[in-house]
């Protein structure tokens, strides 16, 4: 990120003063691990995971991003929530499926989803390896990749469309968001792909 640890701590303290409870920060690794916030209330080291859920009030579930897409989930009764870090690696590997499964095992019936700001489909140039990583989603995934003219083996990937496909595959069809691009909206969002050395945005969800 390029920021001094003291500045990060100061910013997080300021953010905490505006929140109803302590956020449980994660050590995000582009994986699929999901943790329950209620198991990490003691202020220990950040859990190594890419999704966090809450089954009760008294904590905040944050996800840090700067091109990867934050995905917020909640059951319609409002007593279960989760936040997931959905870059292409985590999305292809199952971070959303794992998060939805954990919510369902905790009692969620109908789940709503919101896709936060991430790299948009006109800016996310990828190679054949990324396209291949989503083959398991079937023919519908192919429409999320548009070949780049004059660049064999290169595609523009639609991360929100892929997220919607993944969500639909696990029964989540009420999905909002996914229309903000971190790369293009320079004055609004941090972007690692655009700036390399940059800050991170925190997207959060909690139970009242």
Feature annotation, model-predicted:
Residues 1-208:
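Active-site microenvironment for binding and transforming phosphate-containing groups
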